[in-house]
Amino acid sequence: VDYAKAHIVTLWCAVIAKATRGVTKLLPKQMTPLQFRLLAQLTLPESERVLPMRAARLLVLKPADVDEAVGVLADRDLLRVCDDGCIELTRAGRERAARLTERLNAFFALCVDDLSEEERAVLADLLRRAFSMPGSCYARRPLAGEASEAFDARRGLAATAMLHYAVQTAVKKATSLSLTDFRFLLELYPKRRTAARMLRARDMVAFLRTGRAYVTTASVRLEEQGYLVRVPDERDARGILFKLTPQGMICVQEVAEDLYAVLVSMFGEAVEERVVQRALKHLLELEDAALDALAELPW
């Protein structure tokens, strides 16, 4: 993969991962994004009482995954299964969905409200391309034709889930690494024709938005697998720098090439347009600020 492609893949992976992290931080620990998406779908007038199979089609999810979510949410009294097999929200479920929707709407608003009109239009076009991709189940849904100036919880979650799944699947097909572990290696890949890129632990914490403990354990694991080496920092006696090995370079090159192909299949040549990259860079900055502000939001 060339340096320009590596930069594009790094940018997209960061945007997707940080949106996913924001969603995960705002949902209760015992609730998955899939479970919340089901609750949110059942709040809509056209689908407030539907069969699980219908809900799966509306959400573009596997029926087995929806059935599992139904069981969990029913046990928590957030939805009920009616005598005819349809599912609907309980009063507690409707209240929980409303509170969580308010939280997620606030997060996504922080991410997009300071974008320029041009940047909003660029991102709206990207989402329309992805949702209306030929052969995609999303193409039959209203999301494909909606203008996305109002990037709310429902649309934000649908986009985040779709993009995260596509990227994560491509990574897992090529390697046994998690998406976060792959991003660890991806950040170490040089984005210009310069010397090898080396980063400190604190740099990785900032780039990946993870804890220091993850960076420590992941670096040991990735070193044992032969993807990176830890070298002493000449400017800091106690510091350690991370650097890709030749095996790590090859891994990043192969997986990044696959990820780039996935992005092109969804967005076409737009992935290479400078205006798109500028919009994504600004979005990434706003995501970082939104993640920092989560603790200060008035719940």
Provide a role label for each language-model segment:
Residues 19-23, 59, 96, 100-115, ...:
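Alpha-helical linker/hinge and terminal dimerization helices associated
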Residues 1-30, 78, 86, 118-175:
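N-terminal leader segment of winged-helix/HTH proteins
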Residues 69, 126, 218:
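Residues in the recognition helix of alpha-helical DNA-binding motifs
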Residues 138-209, 217, 221, 227, ...:
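Mid-protein regulatory/catalytic core that forms ligand/cofactor-binding pockets
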Residues 71-121, 220-277:
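Charged, amphipathic alpha-helical coiled-coil/dimerization segments
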Residues 21-66, 70, 167-211:
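N-terminal helix-turn-helix DNA-binding core of bacterial DNA-binding proteins
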Residues 31-35, 92, 119, 152, ...:
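N-terminal positioning helix adjacent to the helix-turn-helix/winged-helix DNA-binding module
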